[in-house]
Amino acid sequence: MTVITDITELIGNTPLLRLKNFDVPEGVAVYAKLEMMNPGGSIKDRLGDMLIRDALDSGKVKPGGVIIEATAGNTGIGLALSARKYGLKAIFCVPEHFSREKQQIMQALGASIIHTPRQDGMQGAIQKAIQLETEIENSYCVLQFKNRVNPSTYYKTLGPEMWEALDGNIHTFVAGAGSGGTFAGTASFLKEKNPAVKTVIVEPVGSILNGGEPHAHKTEGIGMEFIPDYMDKSHFDEIYTVTDENAFRLVKEAAEKEGLLIGSSSGAALYAALEEAKKASAGTNIVTVFPDSSDRYISKQIYEGGI
């Protein structure tokens, strides 16, 4: 048994699970990276730790300072986890409609939360975070939606872990996009290793990648109101726009068939991965990402179709 000295040592190297109980063509394999196994419960633990270390190493914030961010919750949890380790305070701007559980976890880790109006979306939270940086001495707004550390984190960690786990035998990569960092970084790594890897980006109805108008959706953690600078169309070969109904249906099926407790963004990714599997030939390996678990969305009635 491994002995560790800080919980952040457990970030990364999460399991890759082959899904066995969904109906896919013979010889086609669907794998899921179980990012809820990170210590803070989501894929954003990777990013939070990298952002904190970058901020300190580059002098953007000094010891004892304040980290500020606009977040739906998971990035905030990851940042709070590592801010605690390095003696930094954390303030997060969160749009009103996001999961109560995630906000409670951020506060349990010592963070302060400022709510912004639901109708202002994530852009409203970003503007508030930028304002706070100008008002608070020795503070740094990490701005995950613009920060190149975001895609770099997953280029350096998630992509290589997947590649190594399957000895490079990856044919299709499927993942949702919220800030876009996970997708852009991982897809870039996989395309560099093998340009033939098909990269499939997943968004909810109400996101803009397929040319739709941005509007509210129940699927939490993915969906873009704007496209960040570090993402372009070379990162993805296909877009799946998934309804809330299909995302939440797959959340329930994952629990019933695989014993997996996944969030709605994972449900959307799973829906797209299974659709890709229907078209795939024998010998195809499809890899997707489950960013977090359902336990932080119980108040949002995740198993009743969401609110």
Curated annotation (Swiss-Prot):
Cell membrane among the record's keywords?
no
Required cofactor(s): pyridoxal 5'-phosphate
- CDD domains attached to this UniProt entry: CBS_like
The protein's annotated catalytic reaction(s) are: O-acetyl-L-serine + L-homocysteine = L,L-cystathionine + acetate + H(+)
Give one GO molecular function term. cystathionine beta-synthase activity
Where does the record place the modification N6-(pyridoxal phosphate)lysine?
44
Induction, per UniProt: By methionine. Repressed by sulfate and cysteine.
Q: Which Pfam families match?
A: PALP
PROSITE patterns attached here? CYS_SYNTHASE (PS00901)
User: What superkingdom does the record give?
Assistant: Bacteria
At which positions is pyridoxal 5'-phosphate bound? 74, 178-182, 265
Q: Disrupted gene: resulting phenotype?
A: Grows very slowly with methionine as sole sulfur source.
Which example biological process does GO assign this protein?
A: positive regulation of cell population proliferation
Q: Spell out the GO cellular component terms annotated for this protein, sorted alphabetically and separated by semicolons.
A: cytoplasm
Q: Which UniProt keywords apply?
A: Amino-acid biosynthesis, Cysteine biosynthesis, Pyridoxal phosphate, Transferase
Family the entry assigns: Belongs to the cysteine synthase/cystathionine beta-synthase family.
Name listed for the protein in its UniProt record: O-acetylserine dependent cystathionine beta-synthase
Q: Which gene encodes it?
A: mccA
